[in-house]
Structure formats: C-alpha cells, structure tokens
Amino acid sequence: CGGAGAKCSTKSDCCSGLWCSGSGHCYHRRYT
C-alpha cells in the first residue's frame, strides 16, 4: 500500500488510515 505522500488514484491505493488527496497523494485524514 502507499504511505503518506505516495501517489494514488483512489483511497484504496493508500495504506489503512490514509486518504487520497485531490492532488493524487496519500495523506493522514487528521492533517490538512
């Protein structure tokens, strides 16, 4: 899975607890 900062196209590309940002990178939901 992709860690924070990894490229993603959907949330499922990221590790558990991470979301896919609009710019295409995984991020922790609690961060803005």
Swiss-Prot record:
Disulfide bonds join 1-15, 8-20, 14-26. It comes from the Eukaryota. Reversibly inhibits acid-sensing ion channels (ASIC) in rat dorsal root ganglia neurons. Reversibly inhibits voltage-gated potassium channels (Kv) in rat DRG neurons. It comes from Anthopleura cascaia. One of its GO terms (molecular function) is toxin activity. It is found in: Secreted; Nematocyst. This is Acatoxin 1. The keyword Secreted applies. Keywords: Disulfide bond, Ion channel impairing toxin, Nematocyst, Neurotoxin, Proton-gated sodium channel impairing toxin, Secreted, Toxin. One of its GO terms (cellular component) is extracellular region. The keyword Transmembrane does not apply.
